[in-house]
């Protein structure tokens, strides 16, 4: 399944070269434009199936699936449908209108939540989401990411007491594509 995902990422043209500013604020000579992948039903089904299988193999039990907006929402939705587990969406900022929620979906103290993300660089966005879930009494039992750029996310996430499970490492992508990230 991993090889199939790597091929889909490459064939979807998700690896872009040039000058980019990442969400983390870091500058990079490449960008993983995962949005074209996570709007593809075939890719979403594969990603959801992989996360379901990997979490089962690792013995990770969870009650709910969560993802920070925007990139992780399609992934979390696909996983929610694949597993029949309720979905939580973590907003970037609290709504200024309506209910003013930071988390969409029903969350209760003691919920075991599997958090998903599209791409990690330093892990800042997903750490923020994990802390919000924790503040609401949930236990984040694992964080799955489609692509880890291998730029400190794993270490930063583990420093905060969470565990990162990448489906694909950026080095896997460059190796399969036969290119150097430098």
Curated annotation (Swiss-Prot):
GO terms for molecular function: magnesium ion binding; orotate phosphoribosyltransferase activity. It catalyses: orotidine 5'-phosphate + diphosphate = orotate + 5-phospho-alpha-D-ribose 1-diphosphate. Pathway: Pyrimidine metabolism; UMP biosynthesis via de novo pathway; UMP from orotate: step 1/2. Orotate binds at residues 121, 149. Keywords: Glycosyltransferase, Magnesium, Pyrimidine biosynthesis, Transferase. Signal peptide: none annotated. The keyword Chaperone does not apply. It comes from the Archaea. 5-phospho-alpha-D-ribose 1-diphosphate binds at residues 91-92, 95, 97, 117-125. Its cofactor is Mg(2+). Coiled coil: none annotated. SUPFAM superfamilies: PRTase-like. Pfam families: Pribosyltran. GO terms for biological process: 'de novo' UMP biosynthetic process; pyrimidine nucleobase biosynthetic process. The keyword Transferase applies. Its EC number is 2.4.2.10. It is an enzyme of class 2 (transferase). Belongs to the purine/pyrimidine phosphoribosyltransferase family. PyrE subfamily. Catalyzes the transfer of a ribosyl phosphate group from 5-phosphoribose 1-diphosphate to orotate, leading to the formation of orotidine monophosphate (OMP). Homodimer. This is Orotate phosphoribosyltransferase. It comes from Pyrococcus abyssi (strain GE5 / Orsay).
């Amino acid at each position: 399944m991993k090889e199939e995902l790597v091929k889909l990422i490459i064939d979807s043209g998700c690896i872009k070269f040039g000058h980019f500013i990442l969400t983390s604020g870091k500058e990079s000579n490449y960008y993983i434009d995962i949005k074209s992948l996570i709007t593809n039903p075939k890719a979403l089904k594969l990603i959801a199936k992989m996360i379901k299988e990997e979490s089962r193999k690792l013995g990770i039990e969870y009650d709910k699936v969560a993802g920070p907006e925007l990139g992780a929402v399609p992934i979390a939705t696909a996983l929610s449908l694949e597993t029949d587990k309720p979905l939580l969406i973590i907003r970037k900022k609290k709504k200024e209108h309506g209910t003013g929620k930071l988390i969409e979906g029903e969350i209760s103290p003691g919920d075991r939540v599997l958090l998903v993300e599209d791409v990690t660089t330093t892990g800042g966005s997903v750490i923020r989401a994990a802390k919000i879930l924790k503040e609401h009494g949930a236990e984040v039992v694992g964080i799955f990411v489609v692509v880890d750029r291998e730029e400190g996310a794993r270490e930063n996430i583990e420093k905060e007491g969470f565990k990162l499970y990448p489906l694909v490492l950026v080095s896997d992508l460059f190796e399969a594509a036969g290119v150097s990230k430098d």
